[in-house]
């Protein structure tokens, strides 16, 4: 496996490779992984145990700016809450926890408008680090500008410099098959060279669209686009198989490269924990879990949610169950690929039609909002409804999301060929999913598993009404009591074990042919 991004890095692509590696090992594959080193981070005890028997080879890096700036990094970030925040309980508890994962600060511009004065004083010691982030911003802008004219990505020179070392690894290990993840994209060029040198077939995990991605292509110069298109054509011609993570992406490439459509396959991303076992025994195991360090840390993460909810209850009538805050979670950052606008418009509909419910609804999201968005929320009277959280450590996500009444998935209509990674974290959970987007495959999965509902971004009236209905009937939904066995089985099909079996079958078919 040539997987430049791999654990302990917590990018989506790194976690996909990690899940495959550990489960392929259980299917009697001898797995070797070549990956970029992650400075300052180490494998967790759980990761070490899962990867026993898997050979790991690190590629040295002089520096790495992707660890703390990637929007797809799911690692632990030192917690701060922006926007509507009246307590620093979460910050205090997380900062006391011991972890081997490097912590990074989230820059919080213009926070004085949203943070109480006493909270500002408690954060005096952090301002020097904020300044460091600001100083680095011009450098990053220069790098981003350079990447517009650079084909693939700026990892290519480094990976190219390690070609001979990677070749020596392959000569030593004598693999039957090479597998590469296109994260970063420069891995595609590397795998072609290695395959030719050793005569070993290769499988490419494209995951998302490469040159056919409208958002990515818009950021590249015409020259860079031509180079990338030429590389993509050659990779598709030479690869033994190509894997995508969404049906829309698969169809897009099968139409564009019809002569090679038969070598293209769909293997979704997946969740990676035995939710059926934990769901069925959740009540019985509660006392045991509370003695578990991981569970205690998760409770620390949710402490802010609970304390915030308690404060909100005091502002409404205590006797009514409808006075309880209705908590939604968007396990991501608002950006062009996951726009905030549909939620703003839906909340305005709720404000107009259901004033009591509006006063109780809260949406927790990862990261800070842009200044322009913060001002818009303030002008519309929505600042109390949107609450920022720090990124949640990946291994604590399953327990953390159970604190909420609903889970939000957002997808820009022009990116309907992909499925957001957070969707797979939501799927085996208990709270219902509200998907806002146009990906038909997601809608089909939600329908077949009875896990939620999908709306297009303009359906703000319908979104508002569904949220109101969920608030009225919350507590009646449960994977244990309200979901039939056949629907549970449909959810299990998207587990990492099942998806790895699909990948294993594909590998065997390539080797036999």
Describe each region flagged by the PLM.
Residues 358-396:
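Nucleotide-activated donor-binding/catalytic signature segment of Leloir-type glycosyltransferases, i.e.
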Residues 458-462, 475-510:
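A charged, aromatic-enriched C-terminal amphipathic alpha-helix characteristic of glycosyltransferases
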Residues 248, 270:
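Carbohydrate-associated surface elements
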Residues 12, 338, 393-400, 407-425, ...:
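Nucleotide-sugar-dependent
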Residues 153, 164, 186-189, 193-197, ...:
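Membrane-proximal helix-turn-helix segments that form the acceptor-binding/catalytic region
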Residues 1-88, 92, 96-115, 241, ...:
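N-terminal subdomain of nucleotide-sugar transferases
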Residues 289, 295, 301-306, 321-338, ...:
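Conserved donor-binding/catalytic core segment of Leloir-type glycosyltransferases
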């Amino acid at each position: 496996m040539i997987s430049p991004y791999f654990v302990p890095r917590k990018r989506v692509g790194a976690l996909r490779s990690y899940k495959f590696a550990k489960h392929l090992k259980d299917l009697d594959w001898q797995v070797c992984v070549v990956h970029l080193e992650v400075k300052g981070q180490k494998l967790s005890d759980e990761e070490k145990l899962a990867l026993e028997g898997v050979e790991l080879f690190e590629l040295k890096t002089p520096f790495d700016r992707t660890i703390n700036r990637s929007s797809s990094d799911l690692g632990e970030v030192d917690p701060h809450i922006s926007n509507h925040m009246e307590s620093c309980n979460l910050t205090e508890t997380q900062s006391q926890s011991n972890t081997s994962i490097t912590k990074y600060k989230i820059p919080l511009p213009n926070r004085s408008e949203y943070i109480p004065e006493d909270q500002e004083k408690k954060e005096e010691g952090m301002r020097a680090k904020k300044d460091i982030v600001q100083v680095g911003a011009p450098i990053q802008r220069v790098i981003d500008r350079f990447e517009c004219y650079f084909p693939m990505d700026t990892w290519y020179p480094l990976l190219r410099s390690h070609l001979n070392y990677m070749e020596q690894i392959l000569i030593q290990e004598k693999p039957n098959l090479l597998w590469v993840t296109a994260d970063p994209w420069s891995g595609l060029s590397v795998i072609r060279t290695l395959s030719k040198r050793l005569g070993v077939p290769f499988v490419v995990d494209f995951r998302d669209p490469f040159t056919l991605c409208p958002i990515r292509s818009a950021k590249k110069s015409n020259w860079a686009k031509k180079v990338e298109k030429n590389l993509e054509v050659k990779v598709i011609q030479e690869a033994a198989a190509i894997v995508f993570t969404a049906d829309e992406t698969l169809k897009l490439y099968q139409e564009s490269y019809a002569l090679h459509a038969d070598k293209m396959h769909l293997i979704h991303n997946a969740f990676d924990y035995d939710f059926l076992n934990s769901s069925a025994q959740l009540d019985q195991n509660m006392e045991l879990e509370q003695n578990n360090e991981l569970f205690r840390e998760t409770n620390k993460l949710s402490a802010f949610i609970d304390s915030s909810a308690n404060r909100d209850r005091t502002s409404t009538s205590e006797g009514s169950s409808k006075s309880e805050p209705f908590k939604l979670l968007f396990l991501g950052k608002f950006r062009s690929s996951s726009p905030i606008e549909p939620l703003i418009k839906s909340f305005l509909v709720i404000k107009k039609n259901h004033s009591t419910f509006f006063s109780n609804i809260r949406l927790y999201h990862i990261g800070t909002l842009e200044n322009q968005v913060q001002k818009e929320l303030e002008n519309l009277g929505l600042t109390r409804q949107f609450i920022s959280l720090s990124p949640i450590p990946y291994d604590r996500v399953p327990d953390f999301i159970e604190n909420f009444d609903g889970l939000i998935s957002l997808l820009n209509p022009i990116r309907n060929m992909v499925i957001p990674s957070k969707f797979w974290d939501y799927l085996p959970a208990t709270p219902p999913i509200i998907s806002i987007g146009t990906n038909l495959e997601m809608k089909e999965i939600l329908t077949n598993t009875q896990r939620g509902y999908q709306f297009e971004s303009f359906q703000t009236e319908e979104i508002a009404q569904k949220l109101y209905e969920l608030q009225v009937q919350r507590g009646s939904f449960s994977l244990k009591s309200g979901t039939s066995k056949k629907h549970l089985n449909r959810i299990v099909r998207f587990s990492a074990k099942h998806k790895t079996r699909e990948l294993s079958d594909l590998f065997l078919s390539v080797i036999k042919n």
